[in-house]
Amino acid sequence: QPENKPTETTPEPEPEPEPSEDAGDVYEAIRLINAERAKAGLAELTIDDDLMSMAAVRAAELPEKFDHTRPDGSDWKTVFGEFGVEVPYKRGENAGLGKDTASKQVNSWMNSSGHKANILKDNVTKIGVGYCYGDGAEKKNYWIMIVTN
């Protein structure tokens, strides 16, 4: 009978750091965005399932191309067609990078005039927020907010 000798094992690699527990809390981001709108006397935005799905798609694209242009070179608005939705007349997209919590990301957007303007648009009623933790060479937090009428 063969002897039961222990064999050498390759040590397990150290696990990569995971995002913080509240990272990517898209509903907290929406709550904070609506709080900023309330402070400005604007109506609350309602969560739209299609916009949530579109935002998830766009957030997942950001590690490949952090831009309002999609990885295939098309404009960000082409995501509407993928969901059978006509591009709304009133719309806006905010992209964010590196913030590990909803609070940090919304604060960052509120401290940027263009992003703040999208949050405080008075002619939009719906919102979707997406988040992606990029696990490529650069581990980063990616956020997308889409608002429409």
Model-derived segments and spans:
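Ser/Thr/Gly/Pro-rich low-complexity, disordered linker/stalk segments of secreted
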Residues: 1-20
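A short alpha-helix/helix-coil micro-patch that ends at or immediately precedes a cysteine
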Residues: 19-65
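Surface-exposed patches in mature extracellular/periplasmic domains of secreted proteins
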Residues: 39-53, 66-77, 116-132
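Short, functionally important structural connectors and interaction interfaces within domains
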Residues: 37-39, 43, 87, 111, ...
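Short, surface-exposed glycine/acidic/tryptophan-bearing loops
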Residues: 53-100
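Disulfide-stabilized extracellular recognition modules
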Residues: 96-149
